[in-house]
Regions:
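Alpha-helical structural context
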Residues: 27-28, 110, 127
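Interfacial loop-to-transmembrane junctions
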Residues: 125-148
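Membrane-interfacial helix-loop-helix
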Residues: 1-9, 28-107, 133-134, 140, ...
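Hydrophobic transmembrane alpha-helices of multi-pass small-molecule transporters
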Residues: 18, 55, 147-151
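Transmembrane helix interruption/hinge and helix-loop junction motifs
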Residues: 37, 113-115, 130
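Transmembrane helix boundary and interhelical junction motifs in multipass membrane proteins
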Residues: 12-25, 112-123
Length: 165
């Protein structure tokens, strides 16, 4: 149970998210004396939930908090960086997507590259004032897509090295 909590918490961390938690789950399984005690399927479910849990809060509150903190003495650099990242993500989505904005959001979140996860995608959707329900569906789809891609890559890598599948 403790290992599921680890991957759950890791999946909630910005910039790491699901993309980092899935390889950790594979590593946990590889390091266990009795790997049958740790189900990768349950780990995927726990990781996806952990990755999605902060998303509604990010959509509704992150932009306000970041705007508030951008002129505060100690935190302004980090908050300004986050605001710029959200603006840039939103601009990229809008430039490349045109009318297919929600499909672009799904792909933005779903292609596992650094800085393109659920946190950044949701922040970009918030900055673009996109519809909440449609954005959440796109982000959920993107998280599922990223999970499949990272899972396949981990299965190939860890399977070849440790015999895990």
């Amino acid at each position: 149970m403790k290992n599921y909590l680890y991957v759950f918490l890791i999946s909630m961390v910005p910039l790491i998210e699901l993309r980092g938690a899935i390889p950790v789950a594979y590593g946990i399984k590889a390091a266990m004396a009795n790997p049958e005690e740790f189900s990768l399927l349950w780990a995927y479910i726990v990781i996806a939930i952990g990755n999605m849990l902060p998303v509604p809060f990010i959509f509704f509150f992150a932009r306000r908090v970041l705007e508030w903190g951008k002129d505060k003495k100690i935190i302004w650099k980090f908050f300004t960086w986050c605001l710029e990242k959200g603006h840039k993500g939103g601009e990229k989505l809008q430039e490349k997507a045109g009318r297919g904005l929600y499909v672009a959001l799904l792909l933005f979140v779903g292609i596992p590259l650094p800085g393109t996860g659920a946190w950044t995608g949701t922040l970009a959707a918030s900055f673009l004032d996109m519809d909440f329900k449609k954005s959440m569906l796109a982000v959920i789809g993107g998280v599922a897509l990223a999970g499949i891609i990272v899972g396949v890559l981990c299965t190939l890598g860890f399977g070849a090295i440790f015999g895990i599948n």
